[in-house]
Amino acid sequence: MTLTERLREKISQAFYNHGLLCASYPIPIILFTGLCILACCYPLLKLPLPGTGPVEFSTPVKDYSPPPVDSDHKQGEPSEQPEWYVGAPVAYIQQIFVKSSVSPWHKNLLAVDVFRLPLSRAFQLVEEIRNHVLRDSSGTKSLEEVCLQVTDLLPGLRKLRNLLPEHGCLLLSPGNFWQNDWERFHADPDIIGTIHQHEPKTLQTSATLKDLLFGVPGKYSGVSLYTRKRTVSYTITLVFQRYHAKFLSSLRARLMLLHPSPNCSLRAENLVHVHFKEEIGIAELIPLVTTYIILFAYIYFSTRKIDMVKSKWGLALAAVVTVLSSLLMSVGLCTLFGLTPTLNGGEIFPYLVVVIGLENVLVLTKSVVSTPVDLEVKLRIAQGLSSESWSIMKNVATELGIILIGYFTLVPAIQEFCLFAVVGLVSDFFLQMFFFTTVLSIDIRRMELADLNKRLPPESCLPSAKPVGRPARYERQLAVRPAMPHTITLQPSSFRNLRLPKRLRVIYFLARTRLAQRLIMAGTVVWIGILVYTDPAGLRTYLAAQVTEQSPLGEGSLGPMPVPSGVLPASRPDPAFSIFPPDAPKLPENQTVPGELPEHAAPAEGVHDSRAPEVTWGPEDEELWRRLSFRHWPTLFNYYNITLAKRYISLLPVIPVTLRLNPQEALEGRQPQDGRSAWAPPESLPAGLWEAGPKGPGGTQAHGDITLYKVAALGLAAGIVLVLLLLCLYRVLCPRNYGQPGGGAGRRRRGELPCDDYGYAPPETEIVPLVLRGHLMDIECLASDGMLLVSCCLAGQVCVWDAQTGDCLTRIPRPGSRRDSCGGGAFETQENWERLSDGGKTSPEEPGESPPLRHRPRGPPQPALFGDQPDLTCLIDTNFSVQLPPEPTQPEPRHRAGCGRARDSGYDFSRLVQRVYQEEGLAAVRMPALRPPSPGSPLPQASQEDGAAPEKGSPPLAWAPSTAGSIWSLELQGNLIVVGRSSGRLEVWDAIEGVLCCSNDEVSSGITALVFLDRRIVAARLNGSLDFFSLETHTSLSPLQFRGTPGRGSSPSSSVYSSSNTVACHLTHTVPCAHQKPITALRAAAGRLVTGSQDHTLRVFRLEDSCCLFTLQGHSGAITTVYIDQTMVLASGGQDGAICLWDVLTGSRVSHTFAHRGDVTSLTCTTSCVISSGLDDLINIWDRSTGIKLYSIQQDLGCGASLGVISDNLLVTGGQGCVSFWDLNYGDLLQTVYLGKNSEAQPARQILVLDNAAIVCNFGSELSLVYVPSVLEKLD
């Protein structure tokens, strides 16, 4: 067993056990799932409800003044200002954005030195801001006069009293953690602990105290022991009550003068006004709510077609709850991890969750309802999950692989989308496995088996398409009707689509192909590829710079890499470069401080990194507040009992401050315990975690090497994952038996396929067929040309029927018996007995005359067989107590007297019958059929009207052994019947008159097969030879001649051995040794004749000149059946159970397939399928172009060869007293038609499809004429 098979088995077993668990304990699992949903949705309280997010409006800073309170616009005048933009805001927010770094980085610096010195400068900056005073002609303005004065905090915030300002200006900075006391900060040995002591015990959330004081999200601050960034970012937040433009301008100018930012190009042009809503905006909810309503309606109306579901609306509601809970859990978990769903991917994310969740619901529902309904509920759930386990895990693994690749693209938008997608997939998988599966088990448990049996026939566990309205007679017959005659073996679902209601076909198509998920995955891959190709992060440029700087020629041997000025402008660097660590070396164009270049070029002894981490500014720094939680400002003002509902605040342009700190200052500002505490890097960790990179030439650390190696490692990992993904897609799309015939699908009974595997039960009807009776023994040969039907039984009797009405037109008796029309039920050979009793008198008898010896008047009409016989009921002995002496007897013959074969010995009834004949006034009768004549005794001759002329060598009467031989083959065209006998005799009969037109008995070898095509007759013989005959006739072979009904008792006027004046048969060609053994199959089409023999070969002849074109070898057994059509497609089947397809034009074998366990008994083709049957009573349908088996139909015993093709997409098969119609394209059972009680015990041995959409079924000695139901004609 391979690794894949073992893994698949373990996954299947795990899902099976999980299904048992969910179905066994549904209530506890639903309660547990509900608690998990509530726990994961708890962080949603920190998010705005849909439609309640803040709304923004921007105005220029220049000439800004607060809008008036009564700002009424003229009626009809368009206004760009929103309605809420009236009056002064609650407050003006001014953020001083500080970026600081210690440079150059020394080798003996600790990790705590990254943020201790930058944070200590916050106290100095706060002091500078508080001491700033504006002096102008109007006087002086200080911060206390323009800032927002706050009072006490809310009573419930006692733990924050020493951290947030009270009774003064609302000014926030990281120094608030230490009450703005530098000494307290300097004495703190655990800065990280102090910052995080007020954080929640769970994962970091938005709008925490750290975010309020730092003014930036925690991951952007750089305050961490394990960060690779050496830049610390924070803001000093000032809240003003009134807008004073001069004070703000002077404050900005002073800070930028004291702490310049040369490479900063942040724009200070606009104020952003943010309005906070109070009520839910219904308009924003309409699209999403409409989507979920449509989802509910679609699932509900679709599940109405699934009868295996008890509560349709309950299942639809459970599906909607599953999808909605998955969405809420995803957003809640993202919020818990600090991800605020504000990007474009987050906006489209609810709709992606709907699509993916809908498909997973459909997959589980389809899998569970397709399990056998007679199993216990928990076993059905377990089997359903187990059957889809591998598919579910493959899809989840594929999606996670794509997400992993996307995360390593280093593009922020893709990374954030991938994080959302991971959380969404995990939450959706959890809910599908626990919540929806459990709800489905509860629903199916309600669908009790007793409730099903009320609507289902006993022989199948399928819901009836029309459960009501059955007549009482139909219900009674259900108890005695045999089981379903078919067992259908279906290939994997990729090869077929069942004919279902359109809703279910759409649902199961989505569930089977997972189209939406695959389209989403493909779209994600394309999106990631486009972003990587366009290189928004500048990765290729960065790598090129790294390769240039790492050249073995040294840094001085190569000049700076020429980059066009439009690519990396010095004044406004590309914002995408902000994703690189600040310590990564930049191109010379970005280094705008020329005074530092000589210092960097000559590294000093003991310096760890010669380059200072460049502090860069980008446009994203202008509105850093957007990365904060939307509750950031409402939370801050709520602490002081100030509400922002239905009000707005104004955010002033950010003031950038850059701090470049000396390493010596970092060493001087270090706390004494820092060297002995956990700040020092442990020896067990690699130096690369703390240091920038390995040492380069000259003792320096080449940090670029680590980055280059990291990118190479990520690229290698992404390549490996991509290869594995392609392999998985190949295994998913290409089955294991791709290109190989047949499949490994196990054969199952119909009871194991509830509702035909997809909730659809084919209808069952019962009709009274047109029964054609008249044969005494089993019918062996059938032939038809569309208008006439010819049948021959083992007794040698040939009957001609009208295929339209079912009337018997004439009978051709076995030689020696009198031919009669079809008014009676058997040959009237009794007249021969009467003539024998009259001493061999051969007087002619006119048609319609009664026998001359009939004297007794008859009572009620009796059957024609006993119409001229006395009443023998008095001879019946009902005294069964008397023991008669035993006499040697033999079994009674199955046929009536005079129908062909005489008995050698038996009981002599003449002693009993002779007395009755004498009483009736009839002469003594000899019983020649019961007393065989002695050899050499002369036999009385019948008249010429009896069909046998009194010539020498004429055949004996019916009770004597026939020298003409039995009929082995039969063909019909027009009004001519060609008969091939075992004696080698070829006969041509008139189908209407029953007259022998011509015959040929030159060869004594029996005729095993015949072809009658375009006035050419080809006879295949037992000795392997072929005879080609040409038929000449002066009359048309048009079927219009059949309209007249011949008169009864008409007989030929000439001898059976003489040729007719209108029809002549001439032997044109003979192939004496066409095969070495008897020919068993013969077909002709498109000017070609194909023969199959027991010598394992086929031969192709040209029909016009009997020239042998090809000898085809490919079977390992005798050929049993051959098919050829006008398109020159040749198929053959043999005793080896194989089917071969051949190219008639070249003689080459196209395909070879082992189809049956035994002989192939029948073979036919359509434009797209090859249909075969065998002695194993199995009907196989194969794809004609690929040779792959589509499905199999298991027939009843003895019905294996009973099949017929009505059209290219309609197949009819026979069973025990019924015929079934199948859709060849889809492989589903369309309808089963029962042929009444008389045929229930008889298997349909042979089916012949006529041109008028009628079907002739051979039930032994009777034929049933069935017309195709109208519903099938519509489908066709």
Curated annotation (Swiss-Prot):
Keyword Nucleotidyltransferase in record: no
**Among the entry's GO cellular component annotations, what is one?**
endoplasmic reticulum
Q: Where is the motif (ER export signal)?
A: 447-452
Region entry Loop-1: which residue ranges?
Answer: 46-284
Biological processes per GO annotation: cellular response to sterol; cholesterol metabolic process; COPII-coated vesicle cargo loading; protein import into nucleus; regulation of cholesterol biosynthetic process; SREBP signaling pathway
Q: Which residues carry this modification: Omega-N-methylarginine?
A: R1048
Localization of this protein: Endoplasmic reticulum membrane; Golgi apparatus membrane; Cytoplasmic vesicle, COPII-coated vesicle membrane
| Regions crossing the membrane | 19-39, 280-300, 313-333, 345-365, 402-422, 424-444, 519-539, 709-729
Start and end residues of each stretch annotated as Disordered: 60-81, 816-903, 928-957
Q: In this protein, which residues make up the domain named SSD?
A: 284-442
Q: Which GO terms describe its molecular function?
A: sterol binding
Q: Which residues are glycosylated?
A: N263, N590, N641
The record ties this protein, via SUPFAM superfamilies, to: Multidrug efflux transporter AcrB transmembrane domain, WD40 repeat-like
Task: From the record heading this protein, give the residue positions of the covalent cross-link Glycyl lysine isopeptide (Lys-Gly) (interchain with G-Cter in ubiquitin).
Answer: K454, K466
Q: Is DNA repair tagged as a keyword?
A: no
| UniProt-listed InterPro entries | Beta-prop_SCAP, HMGCR/SNAP/NPC1-like_SSD, SCAP, SCAP_N, SSD, WD40/YVTN_repeat-like_dom_sf, WD40_repeat_CS, WD40_repeat_dom_sf
Residue intervals on the Lumenal side = 40-279, 334-344, 423, 540-708
**Entries under PROSITE patterns matching the protein:** SSD, WD_REPEATS_1, WD_REPEATS_2, WD_REPEATS_REGION
Q: Where is this region: Loop-7?
A: 535-710
Domain remark text: Loop-1 binds to loop-7, enabling interaction with COPII-coated vesicles. When levels of cholesterol in the endoplasmic reticulum increase, Loop-1 binds to cholesterol instead, thereby disrupting direct binding between the two loops and preventing the SCAP-SREBP complex from exiting the endoplasmic reticulum. Cholesterol bound to SSD domain of SCAP or oxysterol bound to INSIG (INSIG1 or INSIG2) leads to masking of an ER export signal (also named MELADL motif) on SCAP possibly by moving the signal further away from the ER membrane.
What is the name of the protein in this document? Sterol regulatory element-binding protein cleavage-activating protein
- Provide the species name: Cricetulus griseus
